[in-house]
């Protein structure tokens, strides 16, 4: 099961429904949309994710961007996630998604230029109802497609959730790969250090 809002109330509700359906705990799990995206993107050909991948989800007034990059840790590739949100973008409900994007493409493109000046990604994936259109405006398309592969679709999260479920019986992600999306870090990680002869804990990660 994949959900957009990883909130405890929603997770508890899903858990209660699943229990009433009499599924065992090992038969189901809940993952975030970002994690579904990571499963989907990193199950593709290596050339599509080698430098990193970006997801742009335009379902609401602002665009959510999720960027996944690999870091090597003790011989393992760790997929780390960074998330960013644009400012609210004016949207006219009387017009279709293409017409709205034509009006707002310069504002969105400038935001993406700032974001992608910090990251080198191999591919960009577009999803969300406000990106649902047959073609995309020229300025927006020229920028995104420059030295990058770009894909658009509305079933990305579903495909990613299916691939995530398959990991229990089949290798989906590349060998020696650890998925470390933010919702996967469920505990704090600390190590003891000594500073000026004083023992103290160093916090490495926290939920």
Model regions: which residues?
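Glycine-rich phosphate-binding loops at beta-strand->alpha-helix junctions
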Residues: 1-10, 112-143, 149, 153-154
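Nucleotide/phosphate-binding catalytic cleft detector across ATP-hydrolyzing
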Residues: 1-54, 145-146, 194-207
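Extended charged low-complexity segments that act as oligomerization/scaffolding linkers
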Residues: 19-21, 83-87, 97, 162, ...
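Phosphate/ATP-binding catalytic cores across multiple sugar-kinase/actin-like superfamilies
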Residues: 37-44, 102-120, 164
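Gly/Thr-rich phosphate-binding beta-strand-loop-beta motif of the actin/hexokinase/Hsp70
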Residues: 41-83
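Glycine-rich phosphate-binding loop plus the immediately following alpha-helix
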Residues: 70-109, 164
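Repeat-based blade/solenoid architectures
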Residues: 155-160
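Acidic, glycine/GT-rich loop-and beta-edge segments that sit at the periphery of enzyme/chaperone cores
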Residues: 163-207
């Amino acid at each position: 099961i994949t959900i957009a809002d990883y909130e405890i109330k929603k997770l508890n509700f899903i858990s209660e429904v699943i229990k009433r359906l009499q599924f065992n705990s090992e038969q189901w799990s809940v993952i975030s949309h970002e994690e579904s995206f990571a499963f989907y993107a990193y199950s593709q050909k290596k050339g599509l994710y080698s430098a990193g991948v970006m997801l742009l989800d335009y379902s609401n007034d602002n665009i959510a961007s999720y960027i996944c990059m690999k870091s090597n840790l003790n011989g393992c590739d760790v997929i780390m996630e960074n998330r960013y949100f644009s400012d609210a973008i004016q949207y006219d409900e009387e017009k279709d998604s293409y017409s709205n994007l034509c009006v707002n493409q310069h504002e969105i493109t400038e935001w993406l230029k700032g974001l992608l000046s910090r990251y080198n990604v191999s591919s960009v994936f577009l999803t969300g109802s406000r990106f649902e259109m047959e073609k995309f405006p020229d300025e927006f398309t020229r920028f995104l497609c420059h030295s990058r592969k770009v894909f658009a679709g509305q079933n990305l999260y579903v495909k990613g959730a299916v691939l995530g479920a398959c990991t229990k019986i089949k290798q989906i992600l590349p060998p020696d790969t650890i998925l470390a999306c933010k919702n996967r870090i469920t505990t704090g990680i600390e190590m003891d250090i000594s500073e000026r002869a004083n023992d103290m804990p160093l916090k490495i990660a926290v939920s």
